[in-house]
Amino acid sequence: MTGSTAAARELKAGGSLKGAVRVPGDKSISHRALLFGAIADGVTTIEGLLPAEDPISTAACLRAMGAEISPIGEGDLIRVTGVGLDGLQEPDTVLDCGNSGTTMRLMLGLLAGRDGRHFVLTGDASLRRRPMQRVGQPLAMLGAEVRGRGDGNYAPLAVQGRRLRGAVVGTPVASAQVKSALLLAALTADGPTTVIEPAPSRDHSERMLKAFGADLTVGGEMGRHISVKPGARLQGQHVVVPGDISSAAFWLVAGALVPGADLTVENVGLNPTRTGVLDVLEQMGAKIEVLNRRDVAGEPVGDLHVTSGPLQPFRFGEEIMPRLVDEVPILTVAACFCEGESHISGAAELRVKETDRLAVMARQLKTMGADLDETPDGLVIRGGRPLRGAALDSETDHRVAMSLAVASLLASGDSTLERSDAAAVSYPSFWDDLARLRI
């Protein structure tokens, strides 16, 4: 990995955390609001959109194809003027997805059915190493043509728009990105499409596509069969993006671990396909209350109040993984402070995220004195050993950066963190919020 261009951030150990915090808008919902707004008729307004690097990459790609999207800044109401279901133009440049796997995978589905138009997608060095065939192969069953390095597995990727046919497609993994790419492609196919997942994954696309007017039905065991009939035009909507539970997870674990902590995380999305982290924290004995439950724009929302107390070790595997895949790094930190052995399995997907998150978390936490081992698809953590301050490195991964920040609060001495600015990918104000909540 290359060295940091910025100075390492100092992370002071000790103290406690008190107060209320509102985490940025949900990243998954932010991407989808921009994408669906761009292919709808009329104007879509988005409240609470995550003003971070990944959704900004999605917006830039859509602007390059003719959608009008107002500038994205913190607190802004975003306006998207859609071009209609088949109005995206062939861009005169390569579409740069930055560091965003969601942008690239959803774009593959969005663009596959743009008959007669040609698109090239690329990204940063990390994204160009992430597997894309898991989207390209199922799309090929609809007639899509995606080419790239490694037989279409790695960007840069070329998409030659085709007239797609409807089909029944089984996805190789329970992945909301794969499913959403197929649903986007199905909107302009000739004939209906049914996507069958091996296990349920987050369902933000289904909820939002229905709200925009798509002819979409969900059925089968545990809602694993999603069917789309093409032809229904999407209409611009007002979308309210709830806070991202994946960002809230850092405060939930910090509040449960740091002695004397008392935190309220406000306006958090509580979609049941995303709340696996709450189930695991409950299993650990964390003191978390859900307050002010409500529904906002078709998504369940609430405020989460957490106070500190002793935690028990945990064990979870592939059955819950789609509901908490992004929270594995911070739960690994939590396990370090539980007396006993915790087991994470079924998490091989984390080896192909922005980094190999299993390897990076093991490497960095061992630097602090943690006792943990990697397995091919997970981690075994023997908790209860005190962690020491250390020279740490996010290795460019936003979730690693924030997880290590929480670990450093509980270390016996101060730490430093290289490439701490990685947090901005999903949580630009994280470091400011941490400073404000510390007492």
Curated annotation (Swiss-Prot):
Pfam families for the chain: EPSP_synthase (PF00275)
Family assignment from sequence similarity: Belongs to the EPSP synthase family.
Molecular function per GO: 3-phosphoshikimate 1-carboxyvinyltransferase activity
Protein known as: 3-phosphoshikimate 1-carboxyvinyltransferase
Active-site positions on this chain: D326
Keyword annotations: Amino-acid biosynthesis, Aromatic amino acid biosynthesis, Cytoplasm, Transferase
InterPro entries per UniProt: Enolpyruvate_Tfrase_dom, Enolpyruvate_Tfrase_sf, EPSP_synthase, EPSP_synthase_CS, RNA3'P_cycl/enolpyr_Trfase_a/b
EC numbers for this chain: 2.5.1.19
Protein residues bound to phosphoenolpyruvate: K27, G101, R130, Q177, R357, R399
Binding site for 3-phosphoshikimate: K27, S28, R32, S175, Q177, D326, K353
Gene: aroA
Cellular component GO terms held in the UniProt record: cytoplasm
Assembly, per entry: Monomer.
Compartments in which it is found: Cytoplasm
Protein function: Catalyzes the transfer of the enolpyruvyl moiety of phosphoenolpyruvate (PEP) to the 5-hydroxyl of shikimate-3-phosphate (S3P) to produce enolpyruvyl shikimate-3-phosphate and inorganic phosphate.
This protein's pathway: Metabolic intermediate biosynthesis; chorismate biosynthesis; chorismate from D-erythrose 4-phosphate and phosphoenolpyruvate: step 6/7
Domain of life: Bacteria
Catalysed reaction, written as an equation: 3-phosphoshikimate + phosphoenolpyruvate = 5-O-(1-carboxyvinyl)-3-phosphoshikimate + phosphate
Top EC group: transferase
Main localization of the protein described in the UniProt heading: cytoplasm
GO BP terms: amino acid biosynthetic process; aromatic amino acid family biosynthetic process; chorismate biosynthetic process
This protein's record includes keyword Hydrolase: no
Gene3D superfamilies assigned to the protein according to its UniProt record, in alphabetical order: Enolpyruvate transferase domain (3.65.10.10)
